[in-house]
Amino acid sequence: RDFYAAPRFSPDGSRLAWLEWDMPGMPWDGTEVMVADVAEGRLGHARSVAGGPTESVFQPEWSPDGVLHFVSDRTDWWNLYREEPDGTQRNLTPLEAEFGVPLWELGYATYAFLSDGRIACVYRRDGVHHLGMLDPIIGGVDR
């Protein structure tokens, strides 16, 4: 691959998630979230979790309990997703709203995990920025 960004270790240090993409594409056009096991300081086999040439993904993060979350534009809106134990991904914010930003600014974060299990998030809807709280089990955003 040509570009790598946003490496994040799982809370127990056993897995690493990151973004990658190829030239001539731009990261807001198509990226992938990759995950690999980590053992003795080395990466094991990497697998693609989400994204591709026509789907852009952003901000892979592990929740405190070790569940991978990321933002994807697969619905044409940057929504927040959670990878379920069976490998499927669930849209936690199925809204016509933007929970991500194009990756011309690396390191930007639009969500963070709270100690009570909820997720604090920033999103744009109808051109207005909002701060919300999200329950990752039931989904939906409260302002």
PLM features: what roles do these ranges have?
Residues R1-Y4, L19-M34, S48-F58, F70-R82, ...:
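A flexible loop/linker signature enriched in serine peptidases of the S9 family
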Residues E105-L114:
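Signature of short aromatic-glycine-proline-rich micro-motifs recurring in repeat-based ectodomains
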Residues V38-G41, E84-G87, D135-G139:
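Short loop/turn segments that connect beta-strands within beta-propeller blades
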Residues G13-L16, L68-H69, I119-A120:
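Hydrophobic beta-strand positions that form the internal "hydrophobic ladder"
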